[in-house]
Amino acid sequence: MEQPQEETPEAREEEKEEVAMGDGAPELNGGPEHTLPSSSCADLSQNSSPSSLLDQLQMGCDGASGGSLNMECRVCGDKASGFHYGVHACEGCKGFFRRTIRMKLEYEKCDRICKIQKKNRNKCQYCRFQKCLALGMSHNAIRFGRMPEAEKRKLVAGLTASEGCQHNPQLADLKAFSKHIYNAYLKNFNMTKKKARSILTGKSSHNAPFVIHDIETLWQAEKGLVWKQLVNGLPPYNEISVHVFYRCQSTTVETVRELTEFAKNIPNFSSLFLNDQVTLLKYGVHEAIFAMLASIVNKDGLLVANGSGFVTHEFLRSLRKPFSDIIEPKFEFAVKFNALELDDSDLALFIAAIILCGDRPGLMNVPQVEAIQDTILRALEFHLQVNHPDSQYLFPKLLQKMADLRQLVTEHAQMMQWLKKTESETLLHPLLQEIYKDMY
């Protein structure tokens, strides 16, 4: 069996070569331990001290005067010295892997699957090398640089937040709160953004959605290729727009149900007066729906029927007025909202914040609602700082989006009232009538 070899001057020269090939990517190590100040979750923002590791990385600085990340070697558990060959590794395992690859060493096979730890890592080189490979270590990782800057900053933010949570119970509570909201989101919403984007980008294991781009393909979809609810036949051509509108209503009603169940899972929502719960849902569901609609939209159209179908933007534009006018503003909002690149964990908190707005008309206990929303907003701000360390102004941008959504829903409600007068034969679902009544 090949015996372990210690680092040599030649190996140290190879290390210099590795750094050069990695375009000078900085090591993720530093000086004294740095923890998140306990004063506020906002300390992770751009207002942090310029000497913090997070600020250093945001400014693109390689050196760090403070802030050890305390990363463990993925192979043996020793303290990692940096990101080597694609994983965090200590100097010993980095050198071991480099020698094995460059000298093309072969070790005596071992079938015991030895546990590799710092104290015994030199005992079984075969299992040590196999673990390196299993973790994804590769000599090619050097040629592509080391850790991407965006990934590195996200990692640093997460680790810094984790350290902050250990020293600040309030931050730990916010983290647990965020996780609870996210789990409620995953539990109650059938179509997540992750699922929608995988379908839209063709990465889903499911069949590609059936594309509806004209009356003929709509008819095929109605015959059972897309929707589970079958119809006897399509209406006359001039009523196609009404038929599509009914389909939209059906989806909206189902989403209102999902939002109601989601709201029940928001801590302290169910302790509110029942009238306040109804009021919050009445004014909040459409804002939430239009925010979530962006997840299933791209520039070419939107997913329908739980991802089984895709209606093109051009087909929706071809509908007669006022139905085409109803849909277009939602598309415009979706494109801008998608540019923020939120994920489902962000959306979960954003949707919760929309529902728990203390300035809704007719609330009986405003302070109680505001207290819940304040917790949600603090959790959202902290979560965004960790999840999007490169986007310093994402939180205020989302607050602006909440205002934009309110305006969008106000215009939508007015359009529904106008539709009720001008399209007398077009029926609104009873639940939606209740929501729109005296809304704005």
Curated annotation (Swiss-Prot):
It comes from the Eukaryota. The keyword Cytoplasm does not apply. GO terms for cellular component: chromatin; nucleus. 'Lys-48'-linked polyubiquitinated; leading to proteasomal degradation. Deubiquitinated and stabilized by OTUD3. One of its GO terms (molecular function) is DNA binding. A zinc finger (NR C4-type) spans 73-93, 110-132. Keywords: Activator, DNA-binding, Metal-binding, Nucleus, Receptor, Transcription, Transcription regulation, Ubl conjugation, Zinc, Zinc-finger. It is found in: Nucleus. Residues 210-438 form the NR LBD domain. Its main location: nucleus. One of its GO terms (biological process) is positive regulation of phosphatidylinositol 3-kinase/protein kinase B signal transduction. Residues 36-53 have a biased composition (Polar residues). Disulfide bonds: none annotated. Residues 70-144 bind DNA. It holds the Pfam family Hormone_recep. Heterodimer with the retinoid X receptor. Interacts (via domain NR LBD) with CRY1 and CRY2 in a ligand-dependent manner. Ligand-activated transcription factor key mediator of energy metabolism in adipose tissues. Receptor that binds peroxisome proliferators such as hypolipidemic drugs and fatty acids. Has a preference for poly-unsaturated fatty acids, such as gamma-linoleic acid and eicosapentanoic acid. Once activated by a ligand, the receptor binds to promoter elements of target genes. Regulates the peroxisomal beta-oxidation pathway of fatty acids. Functions as transcription activator for the acyl-CoA oxidase gene. Decreases expression of NPC1L1 once activated by a ligand. This is Peroxisome proliferator-activated receptor delta.
